[in-house]
Amino acid sequence: MKQPTAEQIQEWIDDAHDDIESQKRRLKEGFREKHNLTLEGFFWARGIYYFDIALGHAMLGDRPQAEEALTESIRYLALPYRMAYDEGCEHRDQAAPPEKNGTIGIPQTNSLLLAMAALDNDEINAELIPFVQLAESDEKDQEFMEMVQTIRALQVMLSRGEDSLSASILKTALDHSKSHPIKGAGWRRRTYTINLTLWSVLQRQQETFDEALNLFLKDYETESRGENRDLAFAYASLEAVGMIKLARRYGLKYEGDHPLIPAALL
């Protein structure tokens, strides 16, 4: 896939900064109250803007600015969880019910945890992981069971918990994938490759890790050729960066040079 130019990447960064400033103005003008919008939605959107900024700087090779923007992104994306579950959160009195605010669902939680893995900051993980959790109804969601298990495993791994627990969680997901065949591309196939990659990390299996990561990247690149091709995340995968960072904790290596993996964040 043709890579974006430096000018295009800088335009994405500038647009995201403009969106942040526009959002701040609307908040001051009472736009949220006028249209009965949740505060969580504004925090989540700002987190996505910083996410795009982080990807842009990473693609341009600017590690300090990429890490700074990724940190801001994670903190804003985590705010809806703090509003829901952290009694000490200053915005808790404005929180919508977790199952109604639309910002802490299963895919969002999965993406946030993988972004935290990409940042690889134990201090931030210790601060936020206790609150980055699913609503009870999502915990019991059988349709998305494989991704729920990904979330549970990542919570343990990022907290530096027991490897045996993470492995057991991932085995449950992988066994489910095998007994319920995956047909074609989509979230189930992507989740399977993530679970297989994380499993290989815990087992310290370098060859399986390489194969699973390559499968993930191949699928990611295929999906990026579609409607996402004009967006920053089509050209850089924080999920892949996060899995590589976790692999390094367990003594595994990544020696590739894939265009979807920005070296500035490794």
Regions found by a protein language model. Name each.
Residues 3-217:
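Eukaryote-skewed repeat-based solenoidal scaffolds used as protein-protein interaction platforms
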